């Protein structure tokens, strides 16, 4: 196999794995006789990392707040090359949010393969940019919410909020506690978002979606995202959420080194389901899109391997760049790039094997194959 190590395409190399970590990448002909060898065909790359996954395998995190539910979601996405993800819990009651965090605490303690932490998307968002989120559950952030958001002692916690609704002090407190804070479902103006970035805002959830568009005299959240160098942007590259031209413009403005592919996947990923229920509303799966009856997008019918293929085929990006957007760049955003996102000595053996059409042949998490 060719090896993409996170920076370069390498030929004629072996990847040596011991105790779930990468030991080295020696020339294949230099392998000692005592090493158990497996020959694989295709392209071996760092496993994909997806920071926005609402569900998969028929399970929606909001509905199934259990370790087994989390395990099902992770397993469904693993089939598409995702070796690390943040199961994502969207706007809901305080009680169910606490249950989701507790289930994640248990899943992390149980070392469920592929689970890196939790993404809490809402409920501290803008009602006017709610998208498919239930307005009945949108609310201001209180002290008891901060306790839930900072409850996890291991793994990553990512919170998507509207900075104009929460204020800068809450963002600074979350960031100081190690929580990753993203702006999303926001109607905040440019100045508010830039100031939030100075107070610890780390990124932007599904850039362009659920936020005002960039305008000449009012750049808004999109302008702030593209004009703040040390922030990261999640991109849904499915041909439905954002036009290909708008994605290319964003990458031309900010570069790809702070752009990460996300799926925003729902329960249908990895299944042949034609729809599902979300807070009592039916979501329909048609022509690669998930929508309510009135046509509102409700997450995406996307997996990471498809996002990689779309980025190469639709956006015309080079494969090394795209593979970084699917692995190393999200690892950096999560502050896990010391052990994820590269095939290098000391890194976790989280790997994906792709065929020539960029479909997934096999994955490894901590050196264990699926």
Which residues does each PLM region occupy?
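N-terminal metal-binding scaffold of metallo-dependent hydrolase/deaminase domains
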Residues: 1-32, 364, 369
């Amino acid at each position: 196999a060719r090896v993409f190590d996170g920076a370069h395409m390498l030929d004629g190399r072996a990847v040596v794995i011991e105790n779930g970590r990468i030991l080295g990448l020696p020339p294949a002909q230099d392998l000692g006789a005592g090493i158990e060898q497996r020959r694989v065909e295709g392209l071996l790359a760092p496993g994909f990392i997806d920071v926005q996954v609402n569900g998969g395998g028929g399970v929606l995190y909001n509905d199934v707040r259990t370790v087994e539910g989390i395990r099902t979601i992770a397993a469904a996405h693993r089939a598409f090359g995702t070796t690390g993800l943040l199961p994502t819990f969207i706007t809901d009651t305080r009680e169910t949010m606490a249950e989701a965090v507790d289930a994640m605490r248990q899943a992390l303690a149980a070392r469920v393969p592929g689970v890196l932490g939790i993404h809490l998307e809402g409920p501290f968002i803008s009602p006017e940019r709610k998208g498919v989120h239930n307005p009945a559950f949108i609310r201001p952030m209180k002290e008891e919410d901060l306790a839930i958001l900072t409850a996890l002692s291991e793994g990553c916690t990512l919170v998507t909020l509207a900075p104009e609704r929460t204020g800068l002090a809450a963002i600074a407190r979350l960031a100081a506690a190690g929580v990753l804070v993203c702006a999303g479902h926001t109607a905040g103006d440019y100045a508010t978002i830039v100031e939030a970035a100075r107070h610890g805002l780390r990124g932007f959830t599904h850039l362009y979606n659920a936020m005002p568009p960039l305008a000449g005299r009012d750049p808004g959240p999109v302008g702030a995202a593209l004009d703040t160098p040390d922030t990261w942007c999640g991109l849904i590259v499915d041909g439905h959420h954002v036009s290909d031209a708008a994605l290319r413009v964003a990458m031309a403005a900010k570069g790809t080194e702070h752009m990460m592919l996300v799926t925003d996947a729902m329960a249908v990923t990895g299944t042949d389901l034609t729809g599902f229920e979300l807070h009592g509303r039916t979501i329909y799966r048609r022509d690669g899109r998930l929508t309510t009856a009135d046509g509102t997008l409700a997450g995406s019918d996307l997996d990471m391997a498809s996002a990689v293929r779309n980025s190469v085929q639709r956006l015309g990006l080079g494969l090394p760049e795209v593979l970084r957007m699917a692995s190393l760049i999200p690892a950096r955003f999560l502050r896990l790039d010391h052990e994820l996102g590269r095939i290098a000595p000391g890194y976790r053996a989280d790997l994906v094997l792709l065929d020539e059409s960029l479909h997934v042949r096999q994955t490894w998490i901590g050196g264990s194959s699926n």
